[in-house]
Curated annotation (Swiss-Prot):
The lineage of its organism: Bacteria, Pseudomonadati, Pseudomonadota, Alphaproteobacteria, Hyphomicrobiales. The keyword Isomerase applies. It catalyses: aldehydo-D-ribose 5-phosphate = D-ribulose 5-phosphate. Homodimer. It comes from Brucella melitensis biotype 1 (strain ATCC 23456 / CCUG 17765 / NCTC 10094 / 16M). Pathway: Carbohydrate degradation; pentose phosphate pathway; D-ribose 5-phosphate from D-ribulose 5-phosphate (non-oxidative stage): step 1/1. It comes from the Bacteria. Gene3D superfamilies: 3.30.70.260, 3.40.50.1360. This is Ribose-5-phosphate isomerase A.
Length: 232
């Protein structure tokens, strides 16, 4: 097993200690979240009772294969806890998420939860967000106009950089909701809240990967052990 996976498993195992019998869980998307699902499934086999809302079809499939009971936000609109990964996390626990393409559902599930705990390895911790391209989920209609509006909004925030339509097998990547994703390489984002507000003002933007004031804690695994970051 490579070192990166060991760290993901270590963070997932620590997060599992926050999960109590009978909880309603939001279950994230991505490689670290999948390690959490595998560990959770082992506890479920031993009689541990939880019910989860998956943030993607991929996560739902893994939960079903491993025997983790699932529900929906229609049936269970209020969740106790969401466990999810992140592409970047800063000292204020602002996040960039969406590298796996599930940012809309991830944000809906996180917002429906009493708290959100992020699991990641040390490489995801940054001083300022923006090293990882910011995923922006957009409506397929009017793509060119939406990209132009994103560029203009970024300039007003003092940002600029390439906007690339995400592709998969040579065709535009489609989210579970049927939308496109534009990956924005703005570089450092010193004021995530201002950028967030500017993006939400664009009609063609469905959601973006800035998660602000959603995470309560981040469990970070490094070669020197586990540490927990808490939002001030």
């Amino acid at each position: 097993m490579d070192e990166a996976r060991k760290l993901k498993i270590a963070a997932a195992a620590e997060a599992l200690t926050y999960v109590k019998d009978g909880m309603r869980l939001g279950i994230g998307t991505g490689s670290t979240a999948e390690e959490f699902v595998r560990l959770l499934a082992e506890k479920v086999k031993g009689g541990f009772r939880v019910i989860g809302v998956p943030t993607s079809e991929r996560t739902a499939k893994l939960c079903e294969e491993l025997g983790v009971a699932l529900t929906t936000l229609e049936e269970t609109p209020h969740l106790d806890l969401t466990i999810d990964g992140a592409d970047e996390v800063d000292g204020e626990l602002s996040l960039i998420k969406g590298g796996g393409g599930a940012l809309l559902r991830e944000k809906i599930v996180a917002a429906a939860s009493d708290s959100m705990i992020v699991i990641a390895d040390q490489s995801k911790v940054v001083e300022t967000l923006g090293r990882f391209p910011l995923p922006i989920e957009v409506n397929r209609f009017g793509l060119g106009a939406t990209i132009r509006a994103i560029e203009a909004a970024a300039v007003k925030c003092g940002l600029a950089g390439p906007l690339n339509l995400r592709l998969k097998d040579g065709s535009p990547f489609l989210t579970d909701g049927g939308h496109y994703i534009v990956d924005a390489s703005f570089g450092r984002i010193p004021d995530p809240k201002t950028l967030s507000d500017a993006l939400f003002a664009i009609p063609g933007v469905v959601e973006h990967g800035l998660f602000i004031e959603l995470a309560r804690a981040a469990i970070i695994a490094g070669t020197d052990g586990i540490r927990t970051m808490n939002r001030s």
